[in-house]
Amino acid sequence: MWAACASKLYICVFFLCVASLTSLRAQTLPLSHGERVDYDLYFKWGLIMSKAGLATLSVKESEYQGAPSWHYNLLFRSAGVIEKVFRMRDTMDCHYSKEPRLLFSSKRTNEGDYYLVDNLQFEYQGSGRIDIHSHRHTLKETKIDTMLMAKGRVFDMLGATMYLRSLDWRTMSYGAEFPFMIAIGRELVNARFRYTGQQIVEHKEAKFRTRHFYIDIYDEAFTQAKEAAEVWIGDDENHIPVKIRAKLKIGAAEVYYKDSYNLRAPLTCRIVVQKK
């Protein structure tokens, strides 16, 4: 049971994770070289809410195949009861061009004696087709080595977060939908973000103004396709995830903002409560 829960917690982390839309123009990625955001992860089951992990998202300017890029990095490690029964030390990297387009993704899974690498390389054809080389391997053998082809918006799971952060809220209306696909192994999983307006998020002693989105994910790891997960993005110029909640077959996974450094703009979405 714990192995399954840990795996799904990791899926939730990816949504902490570009082109312009038909009716909504995407703005410049709200990133800053050296940006870092820390998160706490929890497993929630009824009244039980236990610490399950820690995650760090960081961004820096880099190069990919000789061209300028944004390097987006996710570090995840288990904690609490998950750490005791199913230790995880996982990393994910992706490179975005300055256009921006997702160019390359690498996920390294380190779970005790189990080590796995998932690489995705994206090539954009003039016809609008995207060719994706998916290569999955362990230290001893290749598990998957195949080509995926798609049209539209296709990302790795971390890159989907960059897509959400790029959206221009100034012209967004309630109920707006943003479909995309996620490349995983041999599969292209259909998903979409749905905008439902502004909300206040509270966690411990902190409050944040946010924009709320549902995530519809058509994958058997989630209890239902519609509203399988939710994400609350800080309502300021940084567009960083403040809270994420994913329904699991047993309970739910929740991710909360903890701290941030070197953001592009002040974190004005945080509501400062005057002490009496």
Language-model features: locations:
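Intrinsically disordered, low-complexity peptide-like regions
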Residues: 8-9, 143, 233
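Bacterial N-terminal signal peptides
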Residues: 8-20
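Hydrophobic, well-structured mid-protein blocks that either form specific transmembrane helices
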Residues: 120-162
